[in-house]
Design a protein with these regions (language model features):
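Short amphipathic alpha-helical segment within the helicase RecA-like ATPase core
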Residues: 2-261, 265-268
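A generic structural signal for tightly packed, nonpolar segments enriched in small/aliphatic residues
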Residues: 8-34, 66, 137, 151, ...
Length: 500
């Protein structure tokens, strides 16, 4: 057994450690040496995927020891998918936020210390195909190990087709991509777990800039003066109570210049006290997580650039803090948004839709025709769908089906919510502005918030809105995840983007 503290390792081959846990994934379930642990009988494909994911998250939660995983399939595509699913599940379960790494904090530490802040424990993972032994393959002929140190250190594995069956070649090559992805999910969770005094607007801007410089992504952070000049008054209004300047971060990853671009718009409320509609102590708990939309999509940009995804992406991240101060926005204030539409601020704690409306307009001004936004937006969706399921709103049926399929194939849950005109009617009541940011006393706050955002989507633009107040945060440690940010929707959105 390896010494404790040497870090998580993932490798191709058969585990040489006698006391390792042996697990086999077959077409009918998950087995060990003596019995069936999980049965897939009468389960849909989505349920099978979730069962695999949850089982390996439980193993990951234990964080120590070794596990030998045998994938019994002769389907190359399924072998690659299973490798990615299992590795990510193990890392998700193993993840912890390192308390010791926050000592002597300094500017730029969120990026510089992210590997020490992101702790995956000491689990040792071995993965191979079920035909390896039958083919007489010696695992020593091919061993690829991915240590969690830096995503740049994880490159495409070289395979030897003479020594390995085809499925095992796929597994070996898939390991590095899986570790790269799982590591970036860990980074996103770490960003979400950092409190506002350590990860404020300035620190988040610096983090985005560091990623951009590392991978050659075009970067610009619009600050107060530029935001005023542009007319991003909704973002500015939310941040008026803060002593920091607001920011609108734009990151452009363009491997194919001139081709279509997809926008990733992530809500980045670094802390949300509610403004003058001040939250209670109970409701204010965990409000550092109100930037998980920005954190998760920013890390998807890193995954895409590090992995060489051949799809043009534009990240748009509004960064603000909704606090109380002499200049904070008041109930009844009217603002003119970047789109030119005016909005009456009825509820200062309905701030997410304000920063997002300017950001959605900016994304479209940058030439994107498909926009995906991710936001911890409404308690209504949380109440309706619970802790595990994202609310999905979409203005295009075919696109919605693609997102639903990508989420299901990644083991994540979402549920399509209505985007009907009756919800739009609820934001048109203002006598002094084009729109109101809230519908007082009306049920259906999730669809109403989505209807508000839909007002800023131009004709011909495909739009997906994911409301993730529930699944963005694990509110107490359970058998699958430690307490804190979860990296929700990263697997599903990445899978969608990887499709041709």
């Amino acid at each position: 057994m390896r010494e404790k503290g040497t870090g998580m390792k993932t490798q191709y081959g058969t585990c040489p450690i006698e006391e390792c846990r042996s697990v086999k994934v077959t077409g009918t379930g998950i087995e060990n040496d003596c019995c069936r642990i999980v049965s897939f009988e009468k389960k849909s494909e989505a349920q099978k995927i979730r069962a695999i994911r949850e089982y390996f998250m439980e193993i990951g939660m234990q964080r120590v020891g070794a596990v030998d995983i045998c994938l019994e399939t002769d389907d190359d595509g399924k072998a690659a998918d299973l490798t990615g699913l299992i590795v990510n599940a193990l890392y998700q379960g193993a993840y912890r936020f390192s308390k010791t790494a926050v000592r002597r904090w300094e500017a730029g530490a969120a990026f510089a210390r992210r590997d020490s802040l992101t702790d995956f424990g000491d689990l040792e993972i071995w993965i191979h195909g079920g035909v390896a032994d039958a083919a007489g393959v010696d695992a020593a002929n091919y061993v690829y190990t991915a240590d969690v140190v830096d995503v740049d250190a994880v490159n495409c594995a070289e395979t030897n087709p003479v020594n390995l069956p085809a499925v095992d070649i796929v597994i070996a090559a898939a390991i590095d991509c899986a570790v790269q992805f799982a590591t970036c999910v860990g980074y996103a969770r770490t960003l979400g777990n950092l409190p506002y005094n350590l990860l404020n607007i300035e620190e988040m801007v610096a983090y985005a800039q560091a990623i951009s410089e590392k991978y050659g992504i075009r970067f610009h952070a619009y600050r107060e003066a530029e935001l005023k000049e542009l007319g991003c008054n909704a973002i500015l209004a939310v941040n008026q109570g803060s002593s920091e300047e607001a920011a609108l971060v734009v990151m452009e990853y363009e491997p194919r210049p001139g081709e279509e671009k997809t926008a990733l718009v992530g809500k980045g409320l670094m802390f949300d006290a509610g403004g003058y509609h001040l939250k209670s102590m109970k409701d204010m708990e965990g409000m550092q997580y109100d930037m998980c939309g920005a954190a998760n999509l920013m890390e998807i940009l890193e995954i895409s650039a590090a992995g060489g995804l051949q799809k043009n992406l534009v990240g748009v991240f509004p960064l603000a803090a909704n606090l109380i101060g002499p200049s904070a926005s008041r109930m009844g204030d009217i603002i003119e948004t970047l789109s030119g539409k005016t909005v009456e601020i009825y509820n200062t704690d309905a701030e997410g839709r304000l920063v997002l409306c300017d950001s959605l307009t900016m994304a479209q001004k940058l030439g994107t025709k498909c926009v995906i936004d991710l936001a911890t937006l409404t308690y209504s969706c949380h109440a309706a769908l619970g802790d595990l399921t994202a609310g999905l709103f979409c203005n295009d049926d075919a696109l919605c089906k693609e997102i639903e399929d990508a989420m299901a194939q990644s083991g994540e849950r979402c549920w399509r919510m209505p985007l009907d005109d009756c919800y739009r009617d609820e934001i048109l009541w203002s006598a002094i502005a084009d729109l109101a940011n809230y519908a007082p006393g009306r049920p259906g706050a999730g669809p109403i918030a989505a209807a508000y955002l839909h007002e800023f989507i131009e004709d011909g633009t495909q739009w997906v809105h994911l409301d993730v107040v529930g699944p963005a945060v694990q509110r107490k440690s359970g058998k699958h995840l430690a307490k804190g940010a979860t990296g929700v929707c990263m697997a599903g959105v990445c899978r969608f983007l990887a499709q041709e």
